Amino acid sequence: MNNEIDYSIYESVDDLKAAFSINEDKRDEPKGSEKPDKVLKADKLPVVYADLNIKKYHNIFKHWIIFTNDRSDENKTLKNIHEAIKDFDMKPELHIFVAADMDAEEDESRITIRDDEEEFTIEKESNLDTLVFARLGVQGEDECEHAVQLLQDRGFLVLNPIRPSQIACDKYQSACLFEKGNIPQPRFCLMTKEDFYDADSFKAQITRVYPDYNFNDPDKNKDKDLVIKILDGHGGTGVMLIDCKRTTAVLQAIFAIDPERRLIIQRKEEGDGGDIRVHVLTLRNKQIILAAMKRQQLGGDFRSNVSLGAEAVPIKLTPEQEQIALRTAMLSKLPWCAVDIMPLVKGSNKEIGDNVVLEINASPGTFGISEVIKRNFINVMVNELNDPSEFMLQDKTAGFVESINIKFADNVHVDMLAKLDTGNSTTASTMEVGKFADNGKEISFKVGGKNLSFKKQKSMIAKAGEEQYERPTIIVPEITVGLRKVKDVRFAVVKSRENKTTNVLLNRDVLSRLGYTVHPSTAHILTPEMQKIDVSRL
């Protein structure tokens, strides 16, 4: 696996830098942490909490699709889901598939998913009334990943999408992502067998964790304990706290057993005996803190995982903890995640602050948090998913010119060449047409060799220098760009001009609804190039 962080979930690193005030000149791309910048430079994010006192829960989804490894009654998440359904005003149809036994296929309008016990065919147009749960433990199954990808690409809401989940469950990649976003965390480094047996590399890596580490006299490294983690561990497994004097012996033993193992080594921070788990829902235009709990360590174990027996209790977050949780969740591109924060002993690490992020969880458990808040957590979360326009599609980069399909009335489809707006000046999408006529009630025109007529909509006022003029508008039922569709798109209609390369302009609002960002200098990233528009056909 490449050691570099994968930024494929962002359309550019520049957006990440701008959002989190990162000065890239101060960093190369280290294999571990450098001295962190002052954390959380950006303006404060609005803090919104889920309402835990509502009496009736609202569900807008007709179908819930669950991908799991286990249908049995022992599956606590499934148990929570079954219990949650009883409390909703609209009961969804539940479709459960075991990942190891399933497959999926699609045709022009439908996706079919099946396993040994169930088969379900869903229309692609049902993307806004279907909720998909894809737990982390099942995404490693090839057929499950294929099904999740099909649903993601068609705009279904998936908790959680594949690529952000993969980054979150790789402790090194997520640590690099936190560093890029100025999220406070323990100093860290990546350690491989090659690093360990190369003296210079080993020293360089450990120095990233403790810059003043004494390699000549280990006895002088008092209070320089290390936390060693395997990259794909979860639930507290694969985590070790070691005395600095035992570093060499422990690493030697690990690499003797598994020479290919990659480890992340972190500085042991001075915490207060537990950590805080914050569940966050990140939508297109808002974030919601769903619930939070503090997990107390038990029996001298430095870990605080509920699955290992730690005690969980309610907690009121500090303003700093709220901001850290929200920014970490936003950075991850996960619609639903749990951020684990460790409060530090006051003043124990002045370069970081009073809290550090330990990790982010793309598939958090729901049982422990349900007991703490005395509500079924699934109810609380789904109740907040009440506006399809807020569903956070995974960003994908489109070219500044793409071939699109416009669906007009009576199921008339026309392929057209569109320019995708890279600025913010356009107030409406526009369509250039031929043989334009306006009788006051209807407008008619010819496009793509087809004669069409529309009920006239409210005109749009456009500006050209100091002049203002009206443009009639129409609403088309649907447009398709790449693999994504958006319904009810308003276009301002204008007469076609000669030698025009494109005859459609999609504005920023439409692109936002599609979930695309635009590459300013590359065309046809999503679709094959069409021939230049033949104006004579208009």
Question: Language-model segments: which ranges?
Answer:
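Short hydrophobic beta-strand segments
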Residues: 45-53, 59-72, 132-133
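Conserved N-proximal alpha/beta basic substrate-recognition cap immediately N-terminal to
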Residues: 70-197
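C-terminal active-site "lid" helix and adjoining low-complexity regulatory extension at the edge
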Residues: 311-319, 330-334, 343-397
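A short glycine-rich, hydrophobically flanked beta-strand micro-motif that places a catalytic Asp/Glu
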Residues: 266-267, 275-277, 334-347
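A short acidic-Thr-Gly-centered motif at the start of a beta-strand
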Residues: 209-221, 347-348, 401-415
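Phosphate-binding site of ATP-dependent enzymes
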Residues: 224, 235-320
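Pepsin/retropepsin-fold aspartyl endopeptidases
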Residues: 393-538
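Active-site nucleotide/adenylate-binding loops and adjacent lid/helix of ATP-dependent enzymes
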Residues: 10-12, 16, 21-28, 41-44, ...
